[in-house]
């Protein structure tokens, strides 16, 4: 009988995990290559980092963000999935327009059919407001990269992913880079009502 060596880096001391997920990072050699894929408008809109606790997921997410923030015409948005994610996203988009003086450029672009709301509080932003912001960013040839640390499967997460499904359906320019434990990512990917993560990962 062959005595197999146990992996010293596995806190379960060699026990097989209940869930085995494919390596979604396998196409990328480094954080820089992830940023390059985004810069070249890679059609894969979701990049997921998964692994055991303490495996360096957050550190890798941070390294990717540091590379992405250097890209031209790209805005980074950090979303806390313990808060109201849709409203938080809307507030971040409003700040992009204000901080980067994009409001000065809006006048020269047709906005027939919708308006942009800059005076709302976090709680007041709707999915329509967000679609309007994102539509304007597309007209300005800008992209948004959303970063979420410790992604999990909760009601506010479901609401946020449903919003992303709508944004993708309207061909709006965004990417999602997230990290999470294997069980959490599995639950999100296999939620029957959320087709966007499964199609994108």
Residue ranges and their predicted role:
Residues 14, 22, 117-119, 186:
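Generic, ordered loop/turn and secondary-structure boundary motif
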Residues 2-16, 142-145, 156-201:
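The catalytic "switch" region of P-loop NTPases
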Residues 31, 126-130, 160:
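Amphipathic coiled-coil/heptad-repeat helices and related helical stalk/stem segments
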Residues 31, 89-93, 164:
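Short amphipathic C-terminal alpha-helix that caps PH/PH-like domains
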Residues 35, 134-137, 164:
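Hydrophobic core positions within the conserved protein kinase catalytic domain
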Residues 1-44:
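A short, basic N-terminal segment
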Residues 23-24, 51-56, 180:
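Glycine-centered flexibility sites
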């Amino acid at each position: 009988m062959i005595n197999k060596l146990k992996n010293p880096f596995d806190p379960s001391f060699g026990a097989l995990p209940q869930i085995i997920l494919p390596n979604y990072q396998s196409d990328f050699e480094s954080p820089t290559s992830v940023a390059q894929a985004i810069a070249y408008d890679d059609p894969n809109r979701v990049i997921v980092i998964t692994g055991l606790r303490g495996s360096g997921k957050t550190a890798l997410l941070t390294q990717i963000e540091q590379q992405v923030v250097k890209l031209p015409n790209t805005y980074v948005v950090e979303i806390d999935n313990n808060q109201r994610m849709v409203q938080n996203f809307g507030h971040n988009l409003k700040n992009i327009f204000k901080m980067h003086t994009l409001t000065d450029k809006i006048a020269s672009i047709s906005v027939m059919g919708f308006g942009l709301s800059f005076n709302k509080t976090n709680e007041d932003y709707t999915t329509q407001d967000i679609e309007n912001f994102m539509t304007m960013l597309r007209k300005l040839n800008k992209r948004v990269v959303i970063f979420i640390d410790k992604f999990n499967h909760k009601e506010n997460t479901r609401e946020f992913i449903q919003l992303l499904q709508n944004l993708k359906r309207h061909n709006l320019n965004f990417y999602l880079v997230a990290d999470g434990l294997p069980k959490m990512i599995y639950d999100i990917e296999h939620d029957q009502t959320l087709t966007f993560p499964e199609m994108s990962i």
